[in-house]
Amino acid sequence: DEVLDGDDMVVLNYQIQSQSPLSEGASYEIATHLTMTSAAAGDWYLLFETNGNRAQAETDVTNNTLAVPITVTAPDLMVEIVTAPATAQTGQPITVSWRVANAGTAGTSAGPWQDGVYLSTDMALDGADTWVGSFTNHTALAPGGSYSRVQPVTVPIDLAAGSYYVLVRTDNTHVVLEGDGEDNNVTATGIVEITLSETADLVVEEITGPEFVTGVKVKN
């Protein structure tokens, strides 16, 4: 809103030194760049407050704030669909495909950002899940644009057998500034039943050698 209060985000503090003291009727101008790192896309106000620390004595401080309406745009990367085989074996590769779209109101830069692929026993990505691959995108994505990937990944040989989901998270290392658009970066497949692969079973079948062994002892 247009009212400055404790709920507002501070995006810049600018120390004025060269313009002090300011003569009666005089003015100064400041030009700078702001990066909106955490604001959600939509309509906002930029609030400008002069003498915010009240270091300058004034006859009236009620006119120290100005509100300027702005529209914030941001990309919003989302994983639209993920597919994988219904069955897999430990130690063996599977093919995973997914599509990433920009559902936001602004385009991305040319990147790069990574899409991460995980195996999970549930549909929520957390520290208990198993990472199986990361794949880099170097192409800018305009609003409404999308790209598709088809990649082989290998199921870890030491993974326990059971029911798993394949999870794909786009912008896996959070390099794309999406504002509030981070909560749709992960999508899961249906259940993938993973079984243990047959492993080698080495057996000593026979030992051969001479019946008698002669030893030599050397002493200095």
Predicted regions and their residues:
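Extracellular/luminal regions of secreted and cell-surface proteins that mediate adhesion/ECM remodeling
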Residues: 1-220
